[in-house]
Amino acid sequence: MANINFGFEHHAKKLYSGAIEQGISNSLVPMVIETSGRGERAFDIFSRLLRERIIFLGTGIDEHVAGLIMAQLIFLESEDPERDIYIYINSPGGSVSAGLGIYDTMQYIRPEISTVCVGMAASMGAFLLASGNKGKRASLPHSRIMIHQPSGGAQGQETDIVIQAREIEKIRRLLEELLAKHTGQPVEKVREDSERDRWMNPQEALEYGLIDAIFEKRPTPEKKD
């Protein structure tokens, strides 16, 4: 069976597999204590962010991570289908099938999606960054963004390998068409640019159409008289 991924998967496995397989140690996940009239309540930081409609994608993308992201998206839609959802991305990429599951869910649900690159959005991470709603995709000033073509491995009989190679090519064309749709670039240019790793700084990503803005500082709220 073909193993199709969007590159950097070996980096993702090296950096994050231990945390994903064993679970991030509770001692490494900050807890937020909130006090109300009913006493104190503790939240892990990711649950607290979710209450603010913020999803943080900070690992490589595999089926487990995708399942968590999709569940959060669907939950937030059920909570309020009219309010935006914010996805902060710091990811080296990973599985194409897992990433497309996240992508389809982003397109399916009613809330608009704001995406922000914080650190790095490479391969499938860059694809998801560009998949936010037009005008609501951004990057912090020193992030790095990279696009390239999917890679894959196949084994088995020669006929099976041929079938799998065709499937990889179909996936590649699909991703190129979707990226062209979200960036406004011609499909031919996307294919040419993704033949090899194409790294961009935020300004280059802005000009390419992967993002719509570069965030340097949150605006200071106006003081009320």
Swiss-Prot record:
GO cellular component terms attached to this protein's record: cytoplasm; endopeptidase Clp complex
GO biological process terms held by the UniProt record: protein quality control for misfolded or incompletely synthesized proteins
Main location as per UniProt: cytoplasm
Keywords: Cytoplasm, Hydrolase, Protease, Serine protease
InterPro entries given in the database record: ClpP (IPR001907), ClpP/crotonase-like_dom_sf (IPR029045), ClpP/TepA (IPR023562), ClpP_His_AS (IPR033135), ClpP_Ser_AS (IPR018215)
Record-linked Gene3D superfamilies: 2-enoyl-CoA Hydratase, Chain A, domain 1
Pfam families: CLP_protease
EC id: 3.4.21.92
Catalytic activity: Hydrolysis of proteins to small peptides in the presence of ATP and magnesium. alpha-casein is the usual test substrate. In the absence of ATP, only oligopeptides shorter than five residues are hydrolyzed (such as succinyl-Leu-Tyr-|-NHMec, and Leu-Tyr-Leu-|-Tyr-Trp, in which cleavage of the -Tyr-|-Leu- and -Tyr-|-Trp bonds also occurs)
Family membership: Belongs to the peptidase S14 family.
Subunit structure: Fourteen ClpP subunits assemble into 2 heptameric rings which stack back to back to give a disk-like structure with a central cavity, resembling the structure of eukaryotic proteasomes.
PANTHER family (alphabetical): ATP-DEPENDENT CLP PROTEASE PROTEOLYTIC SUBUNIT
Entry protein name: ATP-dependent Clp protease proteolytic subunit
Gene name linked to the record: clpP
